[in-house]
Structures are given as C-alpha cells and as structure tokens.
Amino acid sequence: MFTTFDKYLLTRLIHTFVVFFVATYGLYMVIDLFTNVDDFLREGRSHGEVATSIGRYYGFRMAEFFEMAGPTLIVLSCIAVLGLLEKHSESHPILAAGIPAFRLLRPLLAGGIVLNLLLIANQELLMPSLAVELQTPRGGESASVQKVEPVYDYSNYLMHIDGAEVIIEERRLVNASFNLPRELAVKSYALVAESAVYMPASEKRPAGWLLQNLTGLFDRQLLTEEGQKRVRSAGNGKDVFIVSDVSFDQLYNRGRNLKLLSSWQLIERIRNPSTGFVPVQSQSLALHSRITRPLLSLFSIAMALPLVMRRESRSLIMNMAVCAAVLGGFYALTQASLALGGTHFLRPDLAAWLPVMVMGSASVWTAGYVQT
C-alpha cells in the first residue's frame, strides 16, 4: 500500500519526466526547424498555412520522439529524483527510522512501470495508426506516394516484385512488374501492368496481387504446371491474379517501417512464408527488443538507487557521475549487442536478451553499495 511519501515520490517522478520530455522535444523541434525551415516555406503559402504545416508535422513527430527518447528519459528522471532526495537530505529521516533504502524503489518502479505502459501503448496503438503521417516529409501534405523497394517472394520461388511507386491510401502498386522464375514459367517471363492491387485472403481465393491492364498479351502456355496454379487469368485478357504472400506494406520503406508496426504485425511478418532470412532476422530482433526494453528500464532504476546513495561516498556529484558512467556503459553494451544482432553476428534472441542478463546480475551486485 502506498504511503504519503510514496505518492510524493511518484508525483515527483512523473513531473520530472514531463519536464524532461517537454524540454528535450522542444530543443529537438527548434534545432530541426531552423535547420529545415526552407522545406516548410513553399511558394504561395500564407503564414497561417506555414504555421499549420509546422504544427502538424511536429505534432505527429511527438509520438516518434516519445518512442525513441522515452526509455532514456525515464531513467534520467529517476536519477534526478534520487539526486534531489540526497541534496535536500530527505532520505536521511527514512534511514534513521530503520527503513531500508530499497523501500524507495517501490514508488520509483511503480512510476517506471506506468511510463513504460505508456510507451507500449504508443508503440502498439498510436504509431501504427499514424504510419502515413509519420512518413510525410517536412512541408508535405501527405506521404501518399512512396518509392518502391523491390522484394523477392520466397513463397513463390524467389519471384521478383517491382514497380515505379506505391499509392498508400489506395494500396496500389503503379507500373507493377512481376518477374516469374523458371519454376513458374518455361523461360524468364515478366508480367508488366499499369497497376497492381493486393487482395487479402478470403474464402473464395488465397492472398495475392491483381494485375490490372497488362502491357502486352498474357500467354498462358508459357506457364509451367506450378505456374498455372499460381498465375490465374481474370478472363478479360487484361487482368491477371498472382497468388503471393507478399503484402502491400512490404514494398516500401521496409527498414524504417518496423517501428511503425505493432508487435502483432511483426509476428505476422515473421510467420509469412514470403519473407526471406535477412528480413526475418531484423524483425525478430525488433520484436525481442520491444520485450526487453521495459526490463532494461526497470533494471536501470534498480541500479541507480545504490549508485546515487552510495555509502562509501558522501559526494553527491561523484555519486551522480559514477551512476551516469555505469548506466552509460550498459547503454553502450545494449546498443552494441543490438548492432551485432543486426549484422547477424549474434542470434536475434541472444542479442536482445544478453543486456538483460548482464544488467540483472549487475543490479544484484551493486545492491551492496547502498546506504543503510
């Protein structure tokens, strides 16, 4: 049960986090705006339209910044709260009353859990719903058109899928090109169409792409027996349906899109038979890192207490410096481990969970340094 002092610490933690977030995001916005202000100042725009465009752009970017800087700001807020407790000698009456210093962790961990739940809600609910807006360039109206990143369909014998651009709102691929491999055609054969629309699986047909207005004639005799099962003519001679598990959102900005996907969407991509080994590795790493991020944040809070309230040192500045150095080292370890996982030197699960194991052990080891 929370005491009055617990509520006091929890309120101070939330207040400190809000102040840090507003300050850092405001600094980021000012620097980014002054660096890229020309992108917003288009010809023919009034001052009101420019202000609306700036507000809209940075309003949506707030969710992305919260996802990026949130974990670090949570730990910094806890360190600041502990430092203020020591500076104002607010922890001394608690220790004099025989209450262990680790009792202070209860409100701090509770606040860390609440803030991490907000991070999870932002990652799983808000950012996927703002995916289009978060890809809109500065000064642009909407990121409705994106450049195509060609992919290979591993469920279709490495069929190559390409195009000129994708229209996100219509989920349409413009100037689509589907290069059929030898397993589907007797010779290298490319189906080119004005556009292609992805059709999800239904009771009547599997998932695939409907190619509309083919360029040239479709010769079904060029297809192998397997190709005739996967490439189906629509009957009008201009449209063709190709069975494929490559979804629409796999055709543009795949690397950056991982943070714009919910965890369930990541799991669906990992299970998708059309996804190759390299994308599966990066998607698995992103999924594991989402699971471990709250744990790393809570372990950092647990380590901050004995480092800020060290019994060997009465210098608050020295304690804060040691705490910053130790947690900075573990942050570097985490980033290095994720980088090794991204370059396939470590398995995705090991790359994400190795920092958790190291920090969990270190938090137990540093517990003996706390004041009593």
Pin down the residues of each PLM region.
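Beta-sandwich strand segments
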Residues: L222-G227
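Hydrophobic lipid-interacting interfaces of membrane-associated proteins
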Residues: L214-Q221
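Structural signature for solvent-exposed beta-strand/loop edge elements and short helix-capping sites
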Residues: D153-N213
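Transmembrane alpha-helices
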Residues: M1-S155, I168, V186, D239-T372
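Active-site catalytic microenvironments in core metabolic enzymes, especially phosphate/sugar-handling
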Residues: R230
